[in-house]
Structures are given as structure tokens and as C-alpha cells.
């Protein structure tokens, strides 16, 4: 995502300069940077963000063309240089595509996200105006299943929605003139707000090419577009409001945002954090509304320091790599692997997260996150491809060790998660030698196999070796 945002805004700045400059050498440099950004954006290969941010990119390109319309001059030399750069770009991008073609094909032909048919809907409307509360995530653990499952998915750009839209409309009415950029940004915000919160018919989603975009991924384009329209509106209404009017609007808006954050994160944001939300929203709003001496010399520095502290407090900046590399359980598994190399399986419904931690520490693990599906491995248990729809996807994989072969070896837990139910015999077929499990596997009965405990129980999980009986 950061690379995509960098690519969008660097390319937009260069495109604006390209149209405004007449020096061929400068234009060649701008075009080269634009094409580099285009390659960066294209090779991200994440349609949910590419398509939604593509709408924003198209709006920005359109507005820049409108801004320079009537003054755009492209010489024959400029055209030849641009064609040459395009040709070189196609060669480089083509080589990358050819090299990665297998991976690209695997991703495009998955049941998820390749065959996803999203119609949007399901995003709580309150989440659109509760971005301020996410600033507390680095300082206070967040896990509220009724809203979302983790801090990453719940995080938002602090965009002060809908202040930017309100100010933009106010400014256009005051000036009796439509601001093209603001109008198009508001259109994008409206489109994705409706798509994310309400949804739309599948046929319309297909027409608008949104079937690969989930509601949760819309928050990125909404945040960026809201910030853009907020900055634009602040420039338009500069000096239109007195400090008293700004203070009144700030108080009302900050109160609404504080309430919205409390309502959205009911068990997370208590009374104290509501007050803090009010203060943060108030400072940010006042800085936008009143571009005076107080805003520049007092409010802006306070806000800047606050955002800096919040940003620096995000993992892993705050804690370093110790939470990943110094876990006693993982250190024990590393030691066991060095003594007896072999593949591990992490048993348990939450084993997929622990499996990723194991992989991050160099442990050969069966059920880590599969960005592209490992069809060859899973077809060892499913030669007739009965469950291919389940495991042919981007997914977090959980393992459940059972005593008898399950009627359903694979079960779908979520669009990006499935569980494989296996006996030790099936694990051996997959190449697994060791299992880390919360179950007492050495007390369970298996046909022709058993488990031998090979380490200490740490955090409720014990390492075992699979033993085959003659």
C-alpha cells in the first residue's frame, strides 16, 4: 500500500510538471518517473486496492488535464522521446510479467481473490467518522470481534470525514463557482461510501469493475480522497471564517466525532479516551478551519508532535524485532529443528498465526500463510480435487489433528482461511515430521502411528514427533 500511494502521488506531480514544462529534457525525466511509478503500481497485483485507488488516480489525471487544457504543447521531439520510453517500459515490464507469469496465473485462477464477486456492503457507517480513535491502537490493545478482528484491519487514515466535504461545498456556494477537483473527489467519496456501506447489485458492480474490491479495502481510497478534499477545501475557504466561527464549528464537529468514536468502539474507547478524541478532533479541525497565527504557531506544532508520537509508537518501531525473534516457544522449536531437521505443522484453530511466526524465524512449516495456493501439496490429500474450491485460494491455513480420517478433510472458515483435518498418516504424506499442538497428542489413539513428546509445554503448546509403528 505505501508503494502504491507513493506511485500515485509522485506520478501525479510529475504529470502536472510534464504538461506545464516545455523543455524536452525535463519532460523526458518526468515521463521516466511516471513510467517507473506505473510499473510499481501495476506489479502490486492487488486488485482490491489497485481498482479503488485507480478511480482516484483517474480523477486526479482528469483534473490536471483540465487545469492545463488550452496550454498543452507536445512537440514532435517530445512525442518521439515518450514513445521510446514507453517501448523500453514495455520491455522491462514484459520481462517481469514473463518471469512471474506462473505466480500471476496462480493468483488470477484462485477461488479467492481471483474469482471474487464482491457487491460491497457491510461496512459500519460509523466507521467513516471514527478514524481518530485508531490513533490509540499503538498504546492500547484492540480486539473487538463484533467490529473487526485486529488492529490492522480497523486502522484508518485520520481524515476528519465529513469536514472536508462540508467545507468544500461551503466554499463553492460562497464563491458561486464549482471547484472541479473538489467535485470529483466528493463523487469518488460518495461512490465508495455507498459501495462499502450499502452495496450494489452484482451487474452494476461488474460494470464499474468493483467485483474485486471488498468493503474493507475501500477505507484506503476513502481516507486518501477525504484528506485531499480537506486540504483543497482549506485552501479554498482560507480567511472565510473568523476565529469565533471556527471555534464554534470546531466544538460541534469535535463533539460529534468523539461520540462517533465511542459508539463505534464501545468497549475500547471509554470516557477518558472520549475526552482525548474530542481534544484531538478539536485541534485538527481548528487548524484546518482557522489558518491564523494561533493555528500556525500553537495548534500545528501540537498536532505534528502528536502524530509523530503516534506513528513512532506503531510496531515494530516501538518494540524492535524481539516480539518476533525472542518468543520462548519459537526458540524451543528452532532448537529442536536444528537437532532434528524436518517440516513442522502447527495444530490448533489459531495455528495459522503461529505458523507465520515460525516461518519468520526460519522454521520449515506446513501451514503458513499461502499467498499463492500450494496445489501440489494439498492434492496429495485430494487426488480427485473434491475440495479444490476450498484450498485454491489466498488463505491462512489451520491444521486440526484427528484420530480418524475426516469425511471433510478441508473446511472453509472464512474467504481467506481454511482448516485441514488430518491424521498423522496424512501428515506424513504431506512431509510433516513434527507437530506443535495444544492437544495431548501422546494420549490419543491413531492407526499405526503415535506422537512422541520432544520438548516442554510452553504457553499451552507442546512439541511432538510423529512415530510410525511397524
Q: PLM features: residue spans?
A:
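Soluble catalytic regions of membrane-associated enzymes that act on cell-envelope
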Residues: 310-470
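Periplasmic/ER-lumenal interhelical loops and adjacent helix-loop junctions
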Residues: 96-177, 181
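Transmembrane alpha-helical segments
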Residues: 7-19, 58-63, 67, 165-169, ...
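Perimembrane helix-loop-helix junctions
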Residues: 53-87, 174-176, 283
